[in-house]
Amino acid sequence: MKIHDCCSTADGLVVGVQRHEAVSQHCAQRAVEAVSGVLGRYRFGGSLRLRLQRIMFADDGIVAQLNYRSPRVTVRIQVPIVAEDGIEAIADRLDCHIRRQLTGRPLRSWPDPQRPVVGFVSECRPITRRKRFHLMVLEPHIAAAVMDTFDFDAHLFIDAETGQDAVVYWAGPLGVRLARQSKMAPLSTAGMMTVNPIPTLCLSEQAAIQRVCMYGLPFLFFTDVRDGRGRLLYRRYAGDLGLVQGRATAPGR
């Protein structure tokens, strides 16, 4: 069961909170106070949506997802915490993201100690969230910046250099890696990231699910056998799976 709360602060910040019934109101209030304290220092006003839900595969685990929008910055963060002891981690991550946007600092470092990989072996789990978007046509380094801004583990987009679906994701040795469907052209922005040299697997949706769950993968970028488009299948904190796919036909096909 989901519980919705809404409030506003003295500096004009409008706050909406959605929490799972297993997450106490006291925990939600502490989280609101922590992030409001950060935003109060910047005096941006704006609107904040905070969602708190239990992590089904971790005792006392909570995942906090925060979306903040103001005339100055737009921030999305997602961070797992252990019970109420990790509330400050939400505020710290928000502060870091805002400062990086305001100062133009480089992408966050990887590995990220606040965001352990959500990957574990399990029986085949269902896809409980499907996201269909008109994918943005981006240069790979811009896609990496979008991934960082919205605190994604991986980001699906149309690669401006090849015209194909592609993903960027956090991985060594440079922190960001690019995976393309089949065209393994060298990057025009050399040194920004590494490129996965292996063409993307062509799979059915069910085969992709089996691969993620059998091998404990946090996500899988694959080409769907039905239409030849790229898909991003990922493990959710709730334990089930999510799928991201594009709506429009990619250019250059």
Question: Predicted regions: what is each one?
Answer:
Residues 1-253:
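N-terminal, polar/charged subdomain of small-to-medium soluble alpha/beta proteins
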